Amino acid sequence: MDFAANIPKHHSLDHLARPLVTVDDVLISHKNGQYAILLIQRRNEPFESCWAIPGGFILENEPPDCAAVRKLTSETNLKGISLMPIGVFGDQNRDPRGWMITMAYCAIVDQTAVNAFAGDDAADAKWFDLKWEKSGNDMSLSLTHDELVLRALLRKQEVTTSLGPNIRFDQLENYGIAFDHAKIIATAIERMIDFQDT
């Protein structure tokens, strides 16, 4: 039976906004008390030559978790990484091309056990030393690779949703990190690392 043919016109979805949907992957390495994060350098606009976490668009009929694995593999050549969802990000100004909603994933790995190199639309892939400091609700991020330093300052907000308490970050400053990826990185730290340390 063709259920779509029986939908009344007043139930059509044509009048609703349709954001594009993406996935983003945060890969963090932890060894001897030191943290590192895998970033790719963007080959194309927007944010050409800036550094970002791996990710991209979900294909039609593709489950988000499969898209996350596909984009991680295509941009960094890493396979067999088990990713955990950490949040959904949908601020309307997060991408200059239009309204994008992203589902973010994270994995803690040993960078010495994986061999990442750039592929697809990534110009480069590098591990950056990852450091953060907290002062009240503010978190400062520092990502360094040799002489290259990326920084961001974020403010954490605790919000109550219909599903219970949640956190979100507002980006106060950003130097060199594409899109809203500093917010996603801060969320990964809060959910994956600080949670494990408590």
Set out the residue ranges of the language-model regions:
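N-terminal strand-loop-strand
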Residues: 4-53, 65, 80
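Unchanged
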Residues: 58-82, 87-197
